[in-house]
């Protein structure tokens, strides 16, 4: 098998003009995480499944992009759904000193979480001090909750993911649990995805055989590296069975005409500007009223300054755009 891990960031994908590599892949693993983190002030989910209209980083966009659902719609324009894998994080990101939001969510903070809320941070300077990021294995966060009744799990029923909030310290951490794994399985089934990928395995949790009650030692908590989420994910995928095969693209055109159709454009995040050039090689006049149709993935909204008319028709994962010239 040939697979590739690919970005889910709209900022990166906006500059990608050639996806021809995809035809060689058996599976495409979408890294649908790190949508939000301590690199900016927006306190939002690390890996939301669906868009949330209250996401402060994307609220001004015509179409919210920082979620798995947008990444799926983008890559569905590249290859069949059964070749797409959903990325699932077994780690957290988070902030401290959070202001506003609902239990922190949609709040603001310029301070990534540190200390006990950041045991997987990077030691960038090699001095033993971890760069604040709120990065932790999931099992560590469960241990923190065992020792702190004010550290609580909340559920965002729009994005279909949980998060953790400590109201006294104003700390927010993204999270994953059995409920979000079930939501991801529902999404995989609904979209006919090929499965999932995980980053990173030692973030999953299980009961610790070396548990010492009351201990605050990282290795003596109630939970440690385990397989709780991975087992649930595996059982859910097995129960789901094989994917359906997507239908082949069909050409519904009438009699072909000897013309060239070239689409060129440029990208200025989050907008694309395209020019359509049609060159007539028939030696005869093409009379007014001709049409050009194409499928546009639902990761984008079509707007046009086209001099003729156009229509937009729902076509599953795509919108079929039909341009009609003037007389």
Residue map of PLM features:
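Short beta-strand elements of extracellular/lumenal beta-sandwich folds
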Residues: 260-285
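Short aromatic-acidic-glycine turn motif
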Residues: 294-308
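Low-complexity, Pro/Thr/Ser/Gly/Ala-rich linker/spacer regions in secreted
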Residues: 235-260
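Intrinsically disordered, low-complexity Pro/Gly/Ser/Thr-rich segments with frequent PxxP/GP/PP motifs
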Residues: 304-327
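Glycan-binding loop/region signatures in secreted carbohydrate-active enzymes
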Residues: 39, 45-48, 54-55, 88-187, ...
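Conserved, mostly hydrophobic/aromatic
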Residues: 28, 86, 188, 196, ...
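Substrate-binding surface in catalytic domains of secreted glycosidases
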Residues: 1-130
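Surface-exposed beta-strand/loop patches in extracellular or lumenal glycoproteins
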Residues: 281-298
